[in-house]
Amino acid sequence: MSEIMTKNMARNVFYGGSIFFILIFGALTVHSHIYARTKAVDESQLTPSVVEGKHIWERNACIDCHTLLGEGAYFAPELGNVMKRWGVQDDPDSAFETLKGWMESMPTGIEGRRQMPRFDLTDEEFRALSDFLLWTGTINTQNWPPNDAG
């Protein structure tokens, strides 16, 4: 083999390396998809109430201020583990009451404090939103966020 890389050798290394890394990327993409569909998320827990809660989350643009499992804005707290932080992850009725009470009692007009808007949700919407947040607490995030405070 010669000491100098020829144009043909360089081309072959480029194409071979490109194909190799495209195959690796494809395999990792498939692996991530399979993991997300089979292990990370328990779809058996996706009740109509959880799905409706997700729609309420999207309709009210909660992600514009909050993060959910690290995705979203960092203006307000992470909500992926909020039910665990509040100590109501295993009690749906307490989760509903806690979420409703907290959202309805938001203090207003405090100077220098970030303010969450009042959404005027119905009890059914509060229940669905709390079910959605309870469901997000069951997702295997591999210990993300790294602290309990979100």
UniProtKB/Swiss-Prot annotation:
SUPFAM superfamilies: Cytochrome c (SSF46626). It is found in: Cell membrane. Its main location: membrane. One of its GO terms (cellular component) is plasma membrane. It holds the Pfam family Cytochrom_C. Heme c binds at residues 62, 65-66. One of its GO terms (molecular function) is nitric oxide reductase activity. The chain crosses the membrane at residues 13-29. Keywords: Cell membrane, Electron transport, Heme, Iron, Membrane, Metal-binding, Respiratory chain, Signal-anchor, Transmembrane, Transmembrane helix, Transport. The keyword DNA damage does not apply. InterPro entries: Cyt_c-like_dom, Cyt_c-like_dom_sf. It is a single-pass membrane protein. Component of the anaerobic respiratory chain that transforms nitrate to dinitrogen (denitrification). Heterodimer of cytochromes b (large subunit) and c (small subunit). This is Nitric oxide reductase subunit C. The gene is norC.
